Every structure is written in C-alpha cells, then in structure tokens.
Amino acid sequence: MFFTLSLSASYILIPMEHDKQTNHLKAYGITYWVINQGIEAYWLLNYRGGSFAFPHTKGLENELKVRGVSYQVISDAQWIAIRSEISDPELNQEAVKLEKAPKIAVYTPDFNPRGNRIQPWDDAVTLVLAYAEIPFDKVYDREVLEGKLAQYDWLHLHHEDFTGQFGKFYASQGGTPWYKLNQAKTEELAASLGYSKVSALKLAVAQKIKEYVESGGFMFAM
C-alpha cells in the first residue's frame, strides 16, 4: 500500500538548484533511500542543478515532507517532456538511471588521538552522511587488512597520514600525555596485527586500499 503508484501524478521531481532546494543533503539521502527500496530513480545530470526524479506515491511524498526536502509532483506528460529536453544532443545533459544503492565505508578510527570516542559530528564525512540519513560503516586498519573493503562499493578517506611517523603534532604536542597515549595505542594496534612498526602497518593498509581501487572500488579522498 505504501508504494502504490498514483494514477493522477506520475513522478516526483527533486530540484537541486541552490535557490530551489531547501535541504540538499537530505535530498541526496531520500534518493538513496528510494533506490534502497527497489524503486527506480533518475539522476538528471546538468538539469536544474542535477535533479532527481522517481515515480510518485503518497508514501514517498510524505517521506519528503518529513525530511524537509523540496519537491514537485509532475504529470506523466511533463516527465516525458523533461526526458525529451535532456536527450537533445545540443545540451550537455543526461538522465542516468540509478539502480543500486552503494554500500559505503568510511575509514576512520573509533577514538581520536586524545582517547575520546569519535561521534558522527566530530568527523566531517560521517557528519554529512548521518545528517543526510545515508547508511555507512566505519572501517579502520584492522578491517582493511582483513579484506573487508571488498564488501563495499565506496570508500571515503579524510586527510590521512599513512607514513606512521606521528609527525603532525610532534613539535607542539610531542611531550603531552594524550600524544604519548595515542602513540602507544597505535603501536599496540600495529603489534596486534603483526607489524613491528606503525609505518609498516600504514604501508600495508595503503597497499590494501590501492588494491581495492584497482579492483573497481570507488574511493573519495580529501
């Protein structure tokens, strides 16, 4: 009943222009959710800011209202006209059918260097994904070396240091208790995974990520 198609309205269009969409992140999230429900969706590249469209149901319309996403209900004739406009070879536009919601991993530790558990709002990537309501898993060195990246379609990285040299804050913080604790914990992790040095651990992790990308995995790095 929830996904029964309306006979009077054919499609929902989610405009993505900066002045038309009230919540861009939630718009991405609702589109991910729609695809995950097995409903066909389209990404209209270079059309109205890269809009999204999918078949109309009252249930989907209600979900858009709950999430605060701007949308339009358009008729079947309007949808056909949009598709026709996009297909014009003179325009740099395309309607891409979205068929599978990607499984996402974020490379991030459970604790920050000071020993505090990292919350979604402490991390830029997890903050955005959590707010958009896009599901993701956190992975770190152990999961990468255990080959678990193969379970994911996308991998997100931050400003990562894979040298294992602990050099980022050494000059100003090298003698502080939190810095020494972080170094000790990282060395313990390396030892538990069979590495005598953190630099060797990080090299192995970087190589695993390289293999993941070479095998067709998508990586987004900052």
Name every feature range the model reports, one short phrase each.
Residues 9-124, 132-134:
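Hydrophobic targeting/anchoring helices
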Residues 12, 16-22, 53-62, 80, ...:
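Helical hinge/lid and interdomain linker segments adjacent to catalytic or ligand-binding clefts
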